Swiss-Prot record:
Alphabetically ordered keywords of this record: Antibiotic, Antimicrobial, Cleavage on pair of basic residues, Defensin, Disulfide bond, Fertilization, Secreted, Signal
Biological classification of the source: Eukaryota, Metazoa, Chordata, Craniata, Vertebrata
Job of this protein: Highly glycosylated atypical beta-defensin involved in several aspects of sperm function. Facilitates sperm transport in the female reproductive tract and contributes to sperm protection against immunodetection; both functions are probably implicating the negative surface charge provided by its O-linked oligosaccharides in the sperm glycocalyx. Involved in binding of sperm to oviductal epithelial cells to form a sperm reservoir until ovulation.
Residue ranges of the region described as In vitro binds to LPS, mediates antimicrobial activity and inhibits LPS-mediated inflammation: 21-63
GO biological process, one term: single fertilization
Family: Belongs to the beta-defensin family.
Signal peptide: 1-20
Post-translational modification: O-glycosylated; glycans contain alpha(2,3)-linked sialic acids.
Name the UniProt record assigns to this protein: Beta-defensin 126
Length: 118
């Protein structure tokens, strides 16, 4: 019985020491994962440094981004075609579209009084 308790105590101690690398910091209400660099299919969350620190980005997997579309920055790809006399070339440019409203655009909106009589 003593050896069983000793084995259990050693196992619990080792689990506490080893589990430090198993912990992954989450962000955006446990939807995103804090990483040094996001994968191409993941979305980068704007202002993720507030949740993950200055050296890490908050990356939202593609399957979970529909839950929080207002916080994510999506990369939109536009295709342009240029045709010359002998060859056809196609150039792809990537632009970043921010879906989150900035404080500057919010401050420009001023409320207007509305009368109840019309």
């Amino acid at each position: 019985m003593k050896s069983l308790l000793f084995t259990l105590a050693v196992f619990m101690l080792l689990a506490q020491l080893v589990s430090g690398s198993w912990y992954v910091k989450k962000c955006l209400n446990d939807v995103g994962i804090c990483k040094k660099k996001c994968k191409p299919e993941e979305l980068h969350v704007k202002n993720g440094w507030a949740m993950c620190g200055k050296q890490r980005d908050c990356c939202v997997p593609a399957d979970k981004r529909a839950n929080y579309p207002a916080f994510c920055v999506q990369t939109k790809t536009t295709r342009t075609s240029t045709v010359t006399a002998t060859t056809a070339t196609r150039a792809t440019t990537a632009t970043t579209t921010t879906l989150m409203m900035t404080t500057a655009s919010m401050s420009s909106m001023t409320p207007t009084p509305v009368s109840p009589t019309g």
